[in-house]
């Protein structure tokens, strides 16, 4: 087993912790978390829609590390008249067709179900708080 193999589990445990923290918002329909599910490829988010008014299109990853380190360009579109609303909804529909909504944090695997080598690595990272550092780096 290679240490890098624990990375997807670290991502999943971070997502589970986030969803557990915000479970009330998920229950009330204030927060939707969708998991990408496609048999042939993964999805790497590169855009953001906000309130049918703003769209951010970028080559940059949408995470704090990328915003600190990456020097990629982005395009922020302000569309108060909703001229692009139809296009945005169509694209969102194509994306959501390949996702499933996460209703509860317990739908994600608990770290206790991970392979033993992964559990050891994640415990070691958490004990030394290196998981926090890794989250900043990744």
What is each of the regions a protein language model found here?
Residues 1-138:
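PLD/PLD-like phosphodiesterase catalytic module centered on the HKD motif
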């Amino acid at each position: 087993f290679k240490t890098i193999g624990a990375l997807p589990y670290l991502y999943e445990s971070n997502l589970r912790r986030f969803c557990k923290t915000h479970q009330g918002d998920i229950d009330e329909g204030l927060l939707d978390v969708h998991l990408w599910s496609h048999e042939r490829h993964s999805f790497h988010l590169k855009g953001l829609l906000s309130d049918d008014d703003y769209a951010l299109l970028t080559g940059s990853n949408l995470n704090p590390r990328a915003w600190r380190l990456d020097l990629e360009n982005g395009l922020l579109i302000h569309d108060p008249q909703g001229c692009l609303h139809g296009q945005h909804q169509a694209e969102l529909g194509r994306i959501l067709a390949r996702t499933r909504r996460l209703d509860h944090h317990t739908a994600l695997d608990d770290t206790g179900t991970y392979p033993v080598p992964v559990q050891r690595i994640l415990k070691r990272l958490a004990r030394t708080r290196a998981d926090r550092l890794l989250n900043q780096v990744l």
